[in-house]
Structures are given as C-alpha cells and as structure tokens.
Amino acid sequence: MTYSLQMPRFSISQITTFAAPFADDVRAYAAAGADGIGIWEIKLREGGDGEALEQLQASGLESAAAVPAVPSILPLPLMEGPPEPAARIDAICASLHRLAPFRPSGVVCLTGPGSDRDTVVDGLRTIADEAAGIGLEVGLEPINRVGGEDWTMISSIPEAVELLDDVGRPALGIQFDTWHLWNTPTVLEDVERHVDRFVGVHVADWREPTRNWADRVLPGDGVADLPAILAALDRAGWNGLYDLEIFSDNGAFGNAWPDSLWDLDPDELARRGRDAFERVWAARIQRDVDRVSPGAL
C-alpha cells in the first residue's frame, strides 16, 4: 500500500458557511489554513463578480468544484429554477460562462429526479460541449440512495460511469461525495477503479440517525468510514482538493436543528472543519492496515 506523506490540499465549499457573504468566506477559509474554496454561484451578488474574483485572487485560495445556481437538468425540490429542462440547461450553460473566470476544478451537475434519461443525456452533451469550449470540466454527482429519489437517477459510481459512457463527452466526469456514496457497498473498489474520472471530491460525514439531506456533520463526527474512503482515494492517486461540504439546516430549508453547524461563526466552523479533516486523514493509514491485517499496527 502506498500513501501520500503530505497533507492533501483542503478546501471548503461555500454552502458550509451558508449565511456568510463571499468576502467573509474567503477571509475565514484562508485564515483557517484552507488551500481552496468551492464557489457557489448563489454567493455571487449581482454585479459583484469582478470584486469577488479580486478577493479570491488576493487570498491565494484555489478554486475547487463550483455549484451553479441551477444545478440539475430536471427540477429539484426546495431549489429555485425553471421547470422546463431546456431552460435549465440554458441556465447551466450561462453559469459555466459566469463561473469560468474563477477557474474551478469542475462545475457540479445533477441529473434531477425521474426517469427521463434521454433528456438528461442530451442535456449533459450540451452542457459538456459548452464547458469544453471554455476550458472547463463538468462533474456529474451521484446522490445518496437514501432519499435520493427526489434528487437523482444515479446513486453510485458505476451508475454515473454508465451515464457518462452514454453521453460520450470527455469534458464530463464525476463529482465524488463521501456523504452521498459512503454507504455504497462497493465504494472503495469503485474509487480505485474510476478515480481518473473524478473532477472533484466533496467531504462530509453521516449523522446516525440522520434527520434529512441537510443534516451533515464534520468528518469523524458521524458513522461513515471516512478514513477508509480517504485511504482509497489516496491509494488511487487522487491529488485534487478535498472540499468540505456541510449542509446543516438552521431553518433555511424548513428544519431549524438546535445543533445546526450553520449557526456557528464562519471562522470557527472553518477551523473546526479543517481540524476534523486532518484528524480523519491521519487515521486513514491505521484504518486501512486494520482492514487488510487487523492488529498489524
């Protein structure tokens, strides 16, 4: 088994500090020692893209996977956007051009729920072609099978690969997410087999029992075997950013959890997130050795 001896590059997705404005996110993440930021288009105020880009460049942060304002081809619950797939595809393509100056590692895209695969395939081709024309990649994100019927038609890496192969566009890859895929029976094997198709990695842990999709916890605070997943990514050669993505509803999506991480100060949450990731990263070697040779270390 071969492992990186250095800390990987760590970033924080802006949804993690949901209520903070763009400038506060950049400052808090840089102060916490993060290497990058995952930009959400909803954090860019109208007419403020130039200022946001200057703030990003001055911070020295890299740009991880970005999330467009309309993130899926088919409509999603609780998220705004037109109901017609064609209009949603146009919106995603427009977002690609808006996000391109920030040079994200990829732009996240979901299928949306339902069974209209032909519309999704055609839409992904259009989106991938638009991305390729401006030097971007698109990351198709599988969504957790627990409650995923409201969000997606793919819930595993093999299902994503099959859809990618149907689309047949080199600018389309996979956005891996530990929260969504930790309970896939073959996740470790899937990571090692298909890591070369990943354009981004989201990291969060699974609360048990979980209360809904916006109830994620920091790495190490849940039941997902994150050390094993990070070890698999490390062995497979993933060298991109590990992007912390926390949804923790404080009432914004209808549930005001009393222990919502979104209620924390952005600086505190960024520091805690960084520390939590580093602890889980350090645990990956012990966990992987125990998996193949219990008690060897």
Briefly describe each language-model feature range.
Residues 44-62, 93-100, 121-132, 186-196, ...:
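Short amphipathic alpha-helices and their capping/turn segments at secondary-structure boundaries
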Residues 16-22, 39-51, 73-76, 113-119, ...:
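Acidic-and-aromatic substrate-binding clefts and catalytic sites of carbohydrate-active enzymes
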Residues 2-3, 78-173, 183, 263-269, ...:
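Active-site acidic/histidine proton-transfer and metal-coordination neighborhood
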Residues 26-47, 67-72, 108:
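N-terminal substrate-binding region of glycoside hydrolase catalytic domains
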Residues 2-11, 16-33, 94, 103, ...:
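Histidine-acidic metal/acid-base catalytic patches
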Residues 2-13, 65-78:
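N-terminal small/glycine-rich loop or linker at the start of catalytic domains
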Residues 38, 65-67, 108, 139, ...:
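Conserved beta-strand positions in the central sheet of alpha/beta enzyme cores
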Residues 35-36, 62, 105, 137, ...:
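Residue-level detector of anion-binding/catalytic polar loops
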